[in-house]
Amino acid sequence: MQAKEWAGYEPEGCHPKELISRMTALSVSELIVTTIDSFHDEYICMALENGFDVITEKPMTIDEKKCKRILETQKKTGRKVRVTFNYRYAPVRSQVKELLMTGIIGDILSVDFHWMLNLSHGADYFRRWHRWKKNSGGLMVHKATHHFDLVNWWLNTVPERVFASGDRKFYRPETAGFYGLKNRSERCLDCPEKKKCNFYFDLNKTASLRELYLKNEKFDGYFRDRCVFSSDMDIEDCMNVIVDYKNGTKMSYSLNAFVSWEGYIISFNGTRGRLEHKCEESVYTSGDESVQGALRPEGTWIKIYPNWKPAYSVEIKKSEGGHGGGDPIMLSDIFEPEKQSEDKLKRAADHRSGAWSILTGIAANHSMKKHIPIKIEELVDNLELP
């Protein structure tokens, strides 16, 4: 529906088996992949093997087996794979990159990174297909790939070893009991507790939700409004990760999906001082026509703490649009390359950056399951640097 409004005509659909023939007939040069995460490798490899370049959303894929398949197919075909890490393009995050590149805090020895998903955006992952790792790889892959890529990019390095601990502590039946929701349904539409549940999700709230999901349930059987307190899911909502990087930097990272505000706090500790950056994002729910990841200026800042000198704030670059203003800049970079000059920040990401970002999360998944540190080379060896 939205594509029709934006493009001015009805988008053409086809069966997956007909995709390559239709692309060939239409003289298409690239395939844009935005399927459920677990299918990314199928379409990426299909396109590469048939001579097409690929633009894919994050995460590039969800496990090391699928990652290897993409890397091997890319190497064999020589075609291009671009991963759309829009967070790199947000002016404030580019500003952090620029500051670090100046050496303002010296060599970076450690990083503390804490990401919060609020009770709207965070809860939404537990309603949808993301709630099963077989579809999404869990939040360590689906969501944190953004965050791990930012650190790889900010520090110009890659991960070597990962140790993680995680659990589902909030989105479970016990929490429904805590809130007095004793007669809940497995979906919101017919739930007897809808009037007193703060997590009630109304599929009739907007035309886009109704048209895209509710009216299509009879065709695909997909329920967009599953109960966030169901026991029928296997992803975590509370995760802590320790990462050792190739350049010697250490990072402590956390992701919590049930916090009262949305955004992150990151601190870089260097030989000459400390850089702190906080970012608050607006409330967002997929499909409700709101802007995803728009910044709240009053809650976004950068501060420098030089060794033995007074701390000071850095004026933030203004931005508009989704993902901190990164979406419009990235879209221009992809679809209007003739307008771009050389990017000294190297924000465009290929299959190598896509692989390094997901492998931190994939290693974290293995570590949470086995309770041991995981080396990246044990998952995918001889991976090229970006």
Language-model-derived ranges and their functions:
Residues 1-10, 21, 334:
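N-terminal Rossmann-like dinucleotide-binding module
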Residues 12, 29, 160:
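Conserved acidic residues
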Residues 12-18:
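Short acidic-hydrophobic, aromatic-tinged amphipathic segments that line or gate anion-handling sites
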Residues 25-30, 36-37, 41-88, 103:
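Beta-strand-loop-alpha-helix segment that lines the small-molecule cofactor/substrate pocket
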Residues 37, 41, 62, 66-71, ...:
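Catalytic cores of eukaryotic secretory-pathway lumenal/extracellular enzymes that build
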Residues 87-226, 334, 371:
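Predominantly a Rossmann-like dinucleotide-binding segment in NAD(P)-dependent oxidoreductases
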Residues 209-255:
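Alpha/beta-hydrolase fold catalytic core
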Residues 235-386:
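C-terminal helical cap and adjacent loop that interface with cofactors, partners, or active-site loops
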